[in-house]
Amino acid sequence: MSTLRGFRSVFCDASFFVALFSKKDAEHKRALELFKEIKAEKISLCTSWFIISEAITVLLYKYGYTEASVFGESIHLYQAVHSKETQYHQALALFNLYGKDRTISFVDALSHVLITGVLKNIPAISFDEDFRSLGLTTIS
């Protein structure tokens, strides 16, 4: 059964990229399955430069330079959405609203702002529960 059939684009979280580019990650197998569907369905991959930064840093420190470097060489495959100052302020407000009670990062808050705004609520691929708790359509 196809999880992604019918979608033209998806937003990729750092947790998806980390799982996809590290064979040691607990979600690696699932990330590969999703990536095969993405290729088969010709789905566009959207993300943000904040996500790319987070993913390459986690890959480097958790799994090593090779994984981080291979991911870095792939960034031309993704449509990186550029953020505006007003979106940073919206993300900070969301972070301040939820950050005290849960472990929501600023990057997750900014992703929410981008997905619900300029990206018109496209689904997100994430193994991070924060996306689901923020009310985003999340595939994992």
Can you annotate each of these PLM segments?
Residues 10-13, 47-48, 104-106, 128, ...:
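Histidine- and aromatic-rich ligand-binding microenvironments
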